[in-house]
Amino acid sequence: MLQQPAGGYTTLEQFTFTIRNDGTNATPTQFLQLLSYEATENELVKKAIPTPETHLPSARNVPGNVYIEDAITQALFGISAQNVNAHGYFSRLSALALPNTSARLGLDGVIYNNETVGIPFYDPVAVAKFATTYAKLGNASTPRYRADMIDIYAHVGLELAGTDAERAAGVMPVKRAKFDSWEGSLISLSRDVVYWKNLAFLIDLCSLEGDALNTFKTRNRDAFRMMLFIMSTAVAANVVNRKVTKRVDRVIEYIGSNSMRTAGRTATITYDLSRHEFAAKFLQLTFTKWNATQATTRSMPDMRTPRTSVTSAGESALVRHNRYMTESFKGLSPIALAQKKHEMMLHTHEIHSMDIDGSIKNMVERETVNKMNEIDAMNTMSWKEEIHAVEQTTVHGTHQMSADPEQTQLISQETAVITHRASSDADENEYGNSVSEMTIGTHSDDIL
């Protein structure tokens, strides 16, 4: 809000959020309509955002004036690196939250130590509410107050790519975003958003209440989503260009799934821990305010992967799979274990041929491979040792034959049966060994 004798102006009337395209101004809504989303097999589950701390960092005495708006927007939307020491400048916002403070926040985004003639300032009361929330950006790298980007970033994915039903449930497939037919690059888009009056947006978000806040959020929701989109491409997502004939499609991989979570990613020069922490803290504070009162949202198309229903045959197959997974194989002979492995492998192939959801197939495949690895790890004697034990039993039975002709005949028959079983087991065990050798090196991609 602007400090004016006749009353303050809000961002609803005073500012507009535009992007340059083909030499003209476009709105965030026009850009967001160019985005299409493709669901992947993975699933995104929203977790509750931790309540922000009440602690405000101590306001640092910075000589001169601080261009705070540029510091915030460059860290969120720009392409430059962010040094961890820069977090200290955000602590300066605490001075704006103090009662009877002489500090003022100018419309130009600068924190002035004193009110200056000729410079328009935001309303100090509204600024104090803003500063009480966003001065906590100075806590971004403090371990006690650090926010978890991996969990919080899921909210970005749901707000950008989720349908109404998915946002309500807090669950959606991880999606890729694609956009084309745009004159500029992602760098030019981020530059446009950097020059928005983002502080005015945040001040209104923190100071407006009731119907005025709902009106603000409804009218500016696409501007907020545009900020989240640019933040995704600048901080937490992989962006690739795919050439389709003469057209180049820009694809943002895995909206809502933070690509910086991997250990390999943290070892590269593109990983910026300080900026990562700052973005996480900003999202924690902003989503807490944004979600406090639900704004009216326009209905979005359902972009989820179609889910096929599981047939009765599929249900029977899954019941059988669960039986394999819960069955205890301890005490079984190596021959019997090889048979079980072969049965499970054939059963997995059967499930993969069914018209059921891919995530179920992947689950069956993963659990089957793990169960096979458990079988291989069992400390059982080799099949040769088992055959030797059978032969020893046969010899022992021969020496114990009675002189009674009838008993001798019975023992001879039993011996013949045992010998026949041993021979059959040997043949079957060779097959069992071939199954074992085939499945020992099985990985999740090999069973498909």
Swiss-Prot record:
Keywords: Capsid protein, Outer capsid protein, Virion. Disulfide bonds: none annotated. This is Putative structural protein VP5. Residues 431-442 have a biased composition (Polar residues). GO terms for cellular component: viral outer capsid. Pfam families: VP5 (PF20807). It comes from Lymantria dispar cypovirus 1 (isolate Rao). Residues 418-448 are annotated as: Disordered. The keyword Coiled coil does not apply. InterPro entries: VP5. It is found in: Virion. The keyword Cytoplasm does not apply.
